[in-house]
């Protein structure tokens, strides 16, 4: 129970925060949804066109390609990041010397901005590929795996911290009991360690998946969506362009009338990411109930 004298001051302290939330999030969000049903060059001349923007979004070959490219990227990066992060975390919780230093080194890339990382790795990749007469911007396979390497290098340290917390929460008595029962290290890992860090695995899985779909600045700096490919109808698409970058390029493209389509794409993108987030919350609640 909140005392009445304290309750009186609630509007004074909560008011500015609520106003800032409405101005900074609620109004722009609602305005964005409305504009996704409009055709406009500037928001002041928007006129309602119904579901036309959504129809054009689904018929846009570049948007469809960027969705499948992003989905493939998110799945591959999810597997690699979590396997490597868990392996590093497991190794660093085995009492090796200098483990704190190694944790710091692995975590440091996560503190560097995505744009900076993109340009750094662009120079690294081009320096290597130039010896073979090619560039990361000339081959979509190089671009894809370049983005994977960059994402893994940046995210492994962050996921490692979560896995270390999960590993350190396992009771020592449980590990000692497994050892007394004659379980090998491999059996202990699969039968004891991994089941007990499932909450950490769930969190890292959904974080990796969400980060993979939301990736923007690294994509912009490393490949910019290039190279181009020509479709059968004569149009061209960027082969390494991900969803967020596709939305930006659609909004600020040469055709100003496509801004409504870009807004519709942004709403679809929000629904996708929000769905992943809700699935994570649901999975975490189920784990809490089971425990």
Per-range role (PLM):
Residues 2-291:
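A structural signal for multi-pass alpha-helical bundles of membrane permease subunits
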